[in-house]
Design a protein with these regions (language model features):
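N-terminal Rossmann-like FAD-binding beta1-loop-alpha1 element of flavoenzymes
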Residues: 5-31
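Glycine-rich FAD pyrophosphate-binding loop
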Residues: 24-44
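Helical element adjacent to the flavin cofactor pocket in flavoenzyme catalytic cores
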Residues: 140-198
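Iron-sulfur (Fe-S) cluster-binding segments and ferredoxin-like electron-carrier domains
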Residues: 277, 408-419, 441-458
Length: 475
């Protein structure tokens, strides 16, 4: 039976940051994930924003961790392999009566210590973003806000943790746990068992179920659905900064988000879901997204839409729940991590490390710890000279499999050899299947490469593991 100092349950953005942080110390750490790959829960379908630090008051844990986490992304971007850009955030007021809320956000941002935050006139808003509705009356500008690709961020964090000694076990769905002396004995639904002195519950939507399995606190995580539209990179409606409406008590509203890869996201909605596996989109909600987004950027066209999708966030109260359990020994709760969880996640890693130390975990720094990962060359980012060099080193760079996103066979092979053996895993690692045709032309090529590289037969290829087979029947 495998034995560890720390077991982290859940390989989303929080679990990945915690794993990487603990990899800096002389510890045996395992990261447990119920899905076939990491980043397939909440982390795969969110807005990809580094928030500005003005939406929540500094008295809340989420605001403090958001502010701390936001400052860490420049260093993380240098060390890891994910796209990131500090493009700034605008909050647009379309009516005079919304300016009072803008002033409150500004004062809260100043109190929180947000650098460079600015209340803006109509003229200043249109100078910062010419694509805004000309009826805008004013707003807020936070230059420190940014955008990133969330799944690539998680993949890179996990790669770094692995490189520094963390074990990663996918398809390990926790079924039960019991205390055995100084250890937790954790059994998966498939019957595999690991032992760990300390456990971190970062299971996202399922954190309540995991907490109950360990005899810790009883609470309920309510799934809250956010639906999005994705616009093609050719849209004329792409802003240069993230655009928020004035927030309501329910949510931060429908955003217009320029992505780091050149497309545009509009959304999300915020509706209650009954099922933690309900990722369906609805026509009513998508029409609401289009209407709301056009209020801020009128040039948005339905003709630019290439896909829609939904994500679920873990709703629990008005703040994060991150604490040592008062009921279960050596058990840390990391629950209720909704917006701005992505922004706060690097700081959550630091915070959980401190909680584990407080609980008795001995931390000795690892002299050999290396923060850097290899940055995979991307064909779409290469100039002709660089691409010629890449092709000379690996001819597979000359075979463009996904023409919409200019993804080469070499990149797909690297994704597979890094452990991403589903169509979704390859999509999130490389962006193949993410373009205008949504995989219409490249999926069959990717399936052939998967079969060649893994030895799987055609009927073993899945979209995201489990019962998501792509091809069925006989050929």
């Amino acid at each position: 039976m495998e034995q560890y100092d720390v077991a982290i349950i859940g390989a989303g953005v929080c679990g990945a940051n915690i794993a990487r942080k603990l990899s800096q110390y002389e510890l045996d750490v395992v990261l447990l994930e119920k899905e076939i790959d990491v980043s397939l829960g909440t982390s795969k379908a969110n807005s990809g924003i580094v928030h500005g630090g003005f939406h929540d008051h500094i008295s809340t844990l989420k605001a403090r961790l958001e502010l701390q986490g936001a400052l860490m992304f420049d260093r993380l971007h240098e060390e890891l392999d994910f796209p990131f850009e500090r493009c700034g955030i605008l909050v647009a007021a379309l009516h005079e009566d919304e300016m009072r809320a803008i002033e409150q956000l500004y004062l809260q941002g100043v109190e929180n210590g947000v650098i460079g935050i600015e209340m803006c006139s109509r003229e200043r808003m249109l100078e910062l973003e010419p694509k805004l509705n000309p009826d805008v009356v004013g707003g807020l500008y936070a230059p420190s806000g940014g955008i990133l690709e969330p799944y690539r961020f998680v993949f890179s964090l996990v790669e770094s943790a692995r490189k520094n000694g963390v074990q990663v076990k996918t398809e390990f769905e926790v079924a039960r746990a019991q205390r055995d002396g100084e250890f937790w004995q954790i059994q998966s639904k498939a019957g595999e068992t690991v032992r760990a002195r300390y456990v971190v519950n970062s299971a996202g939507l399922h954190a309540d179920t995991i907490s109950a399995a360990f005899g810790a606190e009883h609470f309920t995580i309510a799934p809250r659905k956010g639906e999005y539209y994705l616009l093609d990179r050719t849209t004329k409606a792409k802003p240069s900064r993230v655009i928020f409406p004035v927030p309501t008590e329910v949510s931060k509203g429908i955003l217009v988000i320029p992505t780091v890869e050149g497309t545009v996201l509009i959304g999300p909605t915020a509706s209650s879901a009954q099922d933690k596996e309900d990722f369906a989109t609805t026509r009513d909600q998508l029409e609401h997204i289009l209407h709301s987004a056009r209020m801020m950027v009128p040039s948005i066209s339905e003709n630019d839409v290439i896909t829609s999708f939904a994500g679920l966030r873990a709703s629990y109260g008005n703040d994060f729940y991150i604490a040592n359990s008062e009921k279960a020994p050596a058990f840390v709760q990391v629950a209720g991590i909704q917006s701005p969880g992505l922004t706060a996640s690097p700081a959550i890693g630091e915070y959980v490390k401190d909680l584990l130390k407080k609980a008795g975990l001995r931390l000795v720094e690892k002299p050999s710890w290396d923060p850097y990962v290899h940055k995979v060359p991307r064909a779409r980012d290469a100039d002709p000279y660089t691409l010629d060099t890449l092709v000379a080193q690996d001819p597979a760079y000359g075979d463009i499999v996904c023409r919409c996103e200019r993804v080469s066979e070499a990149e797909i092979v690297k994704a597979i050899r890094a452990g991403h053996t589903t169509l979704d895993g390859i999509k999130y690692y490389t962006r193949a299947q993410m373009g205008r045709c949504q995989g219409g032309f490249c999926t069959y090529k990717i399936i052939r490469i998967l079969m060649r590289e893994t030895g799987m037969s055609w009927d073993q290829i899945t979209k995201h593991g489990g019962n998501s087979a792509i091809l069925k029947g006989s050929l």
